[in-house]
Amino acid sequence: MAKSKFERTKPHVNIGTIGHVDHGKTSLTAAITKFFGEFKAYDQIDAAPEERARGITISTAHVEYETENRHYAHVDCPGHADYVKNMITGAAQMDGAILVVSAADGPMPQTREHILLARQVGVPAIVVFLNKVDQVDDSELLDLVELEVRELLSKYDFPGDDVPIVKGSALAALEDKDKSIGEDAVRLLMSEVDKYIPTPERPVDQPFLMPIEDVFSISGRGTVVTGRVERGVIKVGEEIEIIGIRPTSKTTVTGVEMFRKLLDQGQAGDNIGALLRGVDREGIERGQVLAKPGSVTPHTRFKAEAYILTKDEGGRHTPFFTNYRPQFYFRTTDVTGIVTLPEGTEMVMPGDNVAMDVSLIVPIAMEEKLRFAIREGGRTVGAGIVSKIIE
């Protein structure tokens, strides 16, 4: 029996459930699979396998399902720390999130923290599921909780007034009880997710960028750089910029090779070698990027959200303070940077997540949402994401 090819006719979107512990994220995930995918019971999702992303162990459950319009990959994490790590490392990229809030409790500390993280790591859109509505008899109380959630979203720069909020009960949906707050609510939620969470631009449609991994000299032909195309398409004869570490320069791609074969173009996901016109072997190095002119710029100072590994995760054994100088691993190379902690934060303990300012000793091609590892002598001690560029 031939293996069936994965039919991708529908647009693909990555989403996940976020929210406070015990508000019903996993029950809702199970309920969605019940109506839109291959049913996964609560226990199957809750026993999430451990994965390693950028040297950090994270427990994440992955399920997939589809609506009439889209195919979804959905992540759900068992513990709060897993969410923090997941969102900061981007182990599971989220194009949108379903925020689950218990109507009985209203927003709680982790509700706030997950919304803040979603803002910091650039999750584009949030849809809310107000869960456990069968535990609240007073409709005015429900309206109050909804208002609180909207205010909290607005506080962190999400459009609180416009965010869709669906009221229901994941448990009722799982147990085939009260259809109006069970199955109907889950179906309504997914139709809101379909409409409200934007379809991400495919990597191949974005401006060309390729991090340089290696540089070779080929006698009689010139300099070849190799790497995996992160996004966009590069065609032979196109002009590109070389960005980062040194002053930005321009060159023309005179050849593209893959698996030793000559191509007329390379695209997102391809591992290619690019032959560059008039570039000296000494004039280019690992850690720089090739990019469409004007699409990305080099920077040294930025604000970041970072997670610092615990000792058990192989991280530091001691806290660090302002002026900490580790290496920041961007794409393919380490660059030393100096950390400034926010006012009122005396020190950062292993296991914390923190907003910090970083100043690199050389510029790197950078944009918001770019992820990095924090390393000391080649050992990963943290992970982060650029939340804002300063200069």
Swiss-Prot record:
Residues 76-79 are annotated as: G3. The gene is tuf1. Monomer. GO terms for cellular component: cytosol. Mg(2+) binds at residue 26. It comes from Bartonella tribocorum (strain CIP 105476 / IBS 506). Its EC number is 3.6.5.3. CDD domains: EF_Tu, EFTU_II, EFTU_III. NCBIfam families: EF-Tu (TIGR00485), PRK00049.1 (NF000766), PRK12735.1 (NF009372), PRK12736.1 (NF009373), small_GTP (TIGR00231). GTP binds at residues 19-26, 76-80, 131-134. PANTHER family: ELONGATION FACTOR TU, MITOCHONDRIAL, ELONGATION FACTOR TU-RELATED. Residues 169-171 are annotated as: G5. GO terms for molecular function: GTP binding; GTPase activity; guanosine tetraphosphate binding; translation elongation factor activity. Keywords: Cytoplasm, Elongation factor, GTP-binding, Hydrolase, Magnesium, Metal-binding, Nucleotide-binding, Protein biosynthesis. InterPro entries: EF-Tu_GTP-bd (IPR041709), EF-Tu_GTPase (IPR050055), EFTu-like_2 (IPR004161), EFTU_2 (IPR033720), G_TR_CS (IPR031157), P-loop_NTPase (IPR027417), Small_GTP-bd (IPR005225), T_Tr_GTP-bd_dom (IPR000795). Residues 55-59 are annotated as: G2. GTP hydrolase that promotes the GTP-dependent binding of aminoacyl-tRNA to the A-site of ribosomes during protein biosynthesis. It is an enzyme of class 3 (hydrolase). Residues 131-134 are annotated as: G4. Belongs to the TRAFAC class translation factor GTPase superfamily. Classic translation factor GTPase family. EF-Tu/EF-1A subfamily. Residues 10-201 form the tr-type G domain. Residues 19-26 are annotated as: G1. Pfam families: GTP_EFTU, GTP_EFTU_D2, GTP_EFTU_D3. It is found in: Cytoplasm. It catalyses: GTP + H2O = GDP + phosphate + H(+). This is Elongation factor Tu. It comes from the Bacteria.
